[in-house]
């Protein structure tokens, strides 16, 4: 005779087919992934029109003529765990001789000339042989005119100087470009207004600190220069006429 009494120890066994059951987290993640993919595709479609244009990954190596002007070369001693101020571009007098040389001697004087960018380039070299360390740099572009920077600061989140021990800073403000029209008259009429309206209205004044990751005091040869990225316009007509042109 069968026993129909209730026994809680006897349970029931269910077999689930994984084909119809999925992890809830995987379902949600997959849905979000599909949503992000669709949004990304829509965003890419809106940028398809830019495929007809070419830009340089490094603006310094992009189109245009680089006009270099060396400001100074000198040797500085830098103690460990500190950075020394090497560029303090706070005054107009610093530019007087610089721009006189730039405009009169080496700048190609033509109308409709456009300076697309100005780079402050700092080249660093150890003066002692067989030294193994890396150069550090830190700079600021925006600060109050009354601010007086310290000559020496502690190393806090610096940047390592990259290839060829060269540190480049773009001084162009957002939007860039500095179209200089009638540069002769603008420069001749008033040097102060030329500096204020043409230079500082379009470019930042930087301050730069340099250091090393060495545990000893190091002697560094510093070369500071300005590189002007000048836009080159194509001529309206060829310079020569004939079968070859």
Curated annotation (Swiss-Prot):
The keyword Heme does not apply. GO terms for molecular function: structural molecule activity. Belongs to the polyhedrin family. Major component of the virus occlusion bodies, which are large proteinaceous structures (polyhedra), that protect the virus from the outside environment for extended periods until they are ingested by insect larvae. The lineage of its organism: Viruses, Viruses incertae sedis, Naldaviricetes, Lefavirales, Baculoviridae. The keyword Aminoacyl-tRNA synthetase does not apply. It comes from Anticarsia gemmatalis nuclear polyhedrosis virus (AgMNPV). It holds the Pfam family Polyhedrin. One of its GO terms (cellular component) is viral occlusion body. This is Polyhedrin. InterPro entries: Polyhedrin (IPR001746). Keywords: Viral occlusion body.
């Amino acid at each position: 005779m069968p026993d129909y009494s209730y026994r809680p120890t006897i349970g029931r066994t269910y077999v689930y087919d994984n084909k119809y059951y999925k992890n809830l987290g995987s379902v949600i993640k997959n849905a979000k992934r599909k949503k992000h993919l669709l949004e990304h595709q829509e965003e890419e479609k809106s940028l398809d029109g830019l495929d007809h244009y070419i830009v340089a990954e490094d603006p310094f190596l992009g189109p245009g003529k680089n006009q270099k002007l060396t400001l100074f070369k000198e040797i500085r001693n830098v103690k460990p765990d500190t950075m020394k101020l090497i560029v303090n571009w706070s005054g107009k007098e610093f530019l007087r001789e610089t721009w006189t040389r730039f405009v009169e001697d080496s700048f190609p004087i033509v109308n409709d000339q456009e300076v697309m960018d100005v780079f402050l380039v700092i080249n660093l070299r150890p003066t002692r042989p067989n030294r193994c360390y890396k150069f550090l740099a830190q700079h600021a572009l925006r600060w109050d005119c009354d601010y007086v920077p310290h000559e020496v600061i502690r190393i806090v989140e610096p940047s390592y100087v990259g290839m060829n021990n060269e540190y480049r800073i773009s001084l162009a403000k957002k939007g860039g470009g500095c179209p200089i029209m009638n540069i002769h008259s603008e420069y001749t009429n008033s040097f102060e207004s030329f500096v204020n309206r043409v230079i500082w209205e379009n470019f930042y004044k930087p301050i730069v600190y340099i250091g090393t990751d060495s545990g000893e005091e190091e002697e560094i040869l510093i070369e500071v220069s300005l590189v002007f990225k000048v836009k080159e316009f194509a001529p309206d007509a060829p310079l020569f006429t004939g079968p070859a042109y």
